Amino acid sequence: MKFVDEVKVHVLSGNGGNGCVSFRREKYVPRGGPDGGDGGEGGSVIFVASEGKNTLLDFRYRHLFKAESGKHGQGRNRHGKGGRDLVLEVPAGTVIKDAETGEPLVDLSHPGDRWVAARGGRGGRGNARFVSSTRQAPRIAEDGREGEDRELVLELKLMADVGLVGLPNAGKSTLISVVSAARPRIADYPFTTLIPCLGVVRHGEAPPFVMADIPGLIEGAHDGAGLGIRFLRHIERTRILAHLVDISQLSPEEPLRPYRLIESELASYSARLGEKKRVIVLNKVDLVPERDRLEALVSRYEQLGHPVFPVSARTKEGLGELLSALVRILSESGVSLPVEDVEEHVGK
């Protein structure tokens, strides 16, 4: 399934039906009164967060969505039928913004959340509504109101318990493929992962949790370098950040540089990311045979004040301790996300 996380759409609600000018025309009733019916209400365009969606692919090639207009009123006090609402399903985690101003309008973060994007036009009143003591035979009726016309941007932010961040080739894809059933593309060159990847992680008897592999960042990402910040929005909804660092490539002179580079990019994107709980994962320890060097690097990273876990995603060394720590932190911070929808797409 192709992953689409941002689209622009044009929504139109239905127009209200016109009211009718009509008079009774019956045998033996030469002066029948007004009997024009009202026009029907126009249908509205409604967005609903659905458990069965995990991408905005349905909106990739179709951009115009219009609800039905209301029917016109008729004689004999027959009111026009209301137009049907147009209900558009989107994944939970979809933010809808005004296309012109960029202002966020609604955040459909939970399945079942609903938002009326364009409300249907009101139906016009028929002439039967205008009878008064001084006007017994009104020859006027109202036209229906026009529906609303809006251009919107739909922006999907994936929801996960743990978000993997780090430079390209830090081993994020390998890690998520080992600890879950996710099968991202893996190769020994930068930017192998071009889209976010979700996986369900099970560890012992603990409740499962959702992990997201976010495409690698590079210096200047917040200014558009590499893959830019397109996928940084997905990190905002994670509860824990797992910052992966390739320990085998650390420079003796500046061992903290890769970590600080990514942290700087995250801070440039959103100050709130700096407040998230995080763990530091020093990956590829199997490529550092010198024990003294390994211990020295771990010690340097421990000084940053976050839990540090030396691991090898390839050999699975240290993964048990890492997963146990993630489970503990998640249990302390609240209920994990439902995993059923993720499992439907990545397997169990």
Curated annotation (Swiss-Prot):
- In short, the EC number is 3.6.5.-
Domain (Obg) spans 1-159
Question: Could you name the Gene Ontology cellular component terms for this entry?
Answer: cytoplasm
Single GO MF annotation: magnesium ion binding
* PROSITE patterns for this protein: G_OBG, GTP1_OBG, OBG
Give the Pfam families listed for this entry. Answer: GTP1_OBG, MMR_HSR1
Q: Which InterPro entries match?
A: G_OBG, GTP-bd, GTP-bd_Obg/CgtA, GTP1-OBG_CS, GTP1_OBG_dom, GTP1_OBG_dom_sf, OBG_GTPase, P-loop_NTPase
The membrane-spanning stretches of this chain are none
Taking every annotated instance into account, which residue ranges of this chain make up the domain OBG-type G? 160-331
Q: Tell me where it resides.
A: Cytoplasm
Q: Where does Mg(2+) bind?
A: S173, T193
Q: Which cofactor does it need?
A: Mg(2+)
Arranged from A to Z, the UniProt key words for this protein are: Cytoplasm, GTP-binding, Hydrolase, Magnesium, Metal-binding, Nucleotide-binding
GO biological process annotations for this chain's record? ribosome biogenesis
Which superkingdom, per the lineage?
Bacteria
Residues where GTP binds: 166-173, 191-195, 213-216, 283-286, 312-314
Family (UniProt): Belongs to the TRAFAC class OBG-HflX-like GTPase superfamily. OBG GTPase family.
Give the multimer and partner information: Monomer.
| PANTHER family tied to this protein | DEVELOPMENTALLY REGULATED GTP-BINDING PROTEIN-RELATED, MITOCHONDRIAL RIBOSOME-ASSOCIATED GTPASE 2
Main function: An essential GTPase which binds GTP, GDP and possibly (p)ppGpp with moderate affinity, with high nucleotide exchange rates and a fairly low GTP hydrolysis rate. Plays a role in control of the cell cycle, stress response, ribosome biogenesis and in those bacteria that undergo differentiation, in morphogenesis control.
Q: What is the name listed in the Swiss-Prot or TrEMBL entry for this protein?
A: GTPase Obg
Q: Which gene encodes it?
A: obg
